[in-house]
């Protein structure tokens, strides 16, 4: 399980980006990968899964 902060999330389009705490890597997140609703600056936990364009955040939930 990874930890990070929501840097951007567009409710209308259903996607955003999470910045991982330990590495400062940013990962794409789609609304289908959410456990709970998220907002910008929320601290979250998430798993990583290979997607079409690299690693995506999945199982995202507020910490």
Q: Predicted regions: what is each one?
A:
Residues 25-36:
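Beta-strand/loop nucleic-acid-binding surfaces
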Residues 13-18:
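Short aromatic-glycine-enriched beta-strand elements
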């Amino acid at each position: 399980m990874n930890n990070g902060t929501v840097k951007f999330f567009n409710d209308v389009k259903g996607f955003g980006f999470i910045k991982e705490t330990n590495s400062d890597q940013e990962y794409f997140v789609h609304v289908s990968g959410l456990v709970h609703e998220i907002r910008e600056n929320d601290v979250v936990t998430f798993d990583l899964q290979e997607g079409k364009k690299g690693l995506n955040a999945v199982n995202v939930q507020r910490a």
